[in-house]
């Protein structure tokens, strides 16, 4: 793996780590507004991770 691939992998892992924290927060939520905000955060982090994966696949010609 080259430096760029490692950086992308690190970015994906960071997004998934934040997603995991949001999942934990989601189960601790006690009102619907917090639940909604947490779900929005989870969605944003997954989309970011998927965009990084998609970009990497496009660069590799897949």
Where are these regions (language model features)?
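Short, charge-rich amphipathic interface segments used for partner binding and complex assembly
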Residues: 11, 15-62
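Short, charge/polar-rich alpha-helical segments
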Residues: 1-13
């Amino acid at each position: 793996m080259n430096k760029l691939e490692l950086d992308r992998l690190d970015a994906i892992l960071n997004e998934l780590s934040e997603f995991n924290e949001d999942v934990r927060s989601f189960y601790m939520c006690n009102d619907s507004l917090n639940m909604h905000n947490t779900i929005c955060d989870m969605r944003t982090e997954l989309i970011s991770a998927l965009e990084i994966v998609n970009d990497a696949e496009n660069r590799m010609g897949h």
